[in-house]
């Protein structure tokens, strides 16, 4: 309650701060692509509407990956972007924890791709949700 009173009493100082914070969160939420949950990825995959791109190393991919995903390690995204861009499906980027996918998404956006999704929490979130890997 005190915080609300402070913000109201100091409106001219607090309003710009609140606006900056909101803009920061909005810009980061779309950076690299739209973040989606594991359940949303399952829905896209079940409808055969997603190309799932696993950005982890080949070793990590071979030790367990999401069904029907392809492996394009993060370092190869620029070089192999034509494989991704040629897809008519939505692109879902998956990495270990979700942060590398943002960088790859930015790279693909620069190449002209628009329909990009990022698995929130990456493969770690997938495992914590007890979802299967092959």
Feature map (PLM): residue ranges:
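Conserved histidine-centered catalytic loops in small-molecule metabolism enzymes
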Residues: 41
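Active-site flanking residues adjacent to catalytic metal/cofactor-binding acidic residues
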Residues: 53
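Rhodanese-like catalytic fold shared by cysteine-dependent sulfurtransferases
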Residues: 1-38, 47-50, 58-90, 99-134
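Short, surface-exposed ligand- or partner-binding patches at beta-edge/loop junctions that are enriched
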Residues: 94
């Amino acid at each position: 309650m005190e915080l609300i009173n402070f913000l109201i009493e100091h409106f001219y100082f607090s309003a710009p701060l609140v606006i900056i914070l909101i803009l920061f969160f909005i810009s980061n939420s779309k950076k690299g692509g739209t973040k989606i949950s594991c359940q949303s990825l399952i829905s896209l995959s079940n409808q055969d509407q997603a190309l799932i791109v696993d950005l982890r190393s080949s070793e990590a991919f071979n030790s367990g990956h999401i069904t029907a995903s392809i492996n394009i390690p993060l370092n190869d995204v620029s070089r192999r972007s034509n494989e991704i861009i040629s897809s008519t499906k939505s692109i879902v980027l998956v990495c270990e924890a979700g942060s590398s996918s943002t960088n790859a998404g930015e790279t693909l956006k620069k190449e002209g791709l628009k329909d990009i999704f990022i698995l929130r929490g990456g493969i770690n979130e997938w495992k914590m949700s007890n979802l299967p890997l092959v």
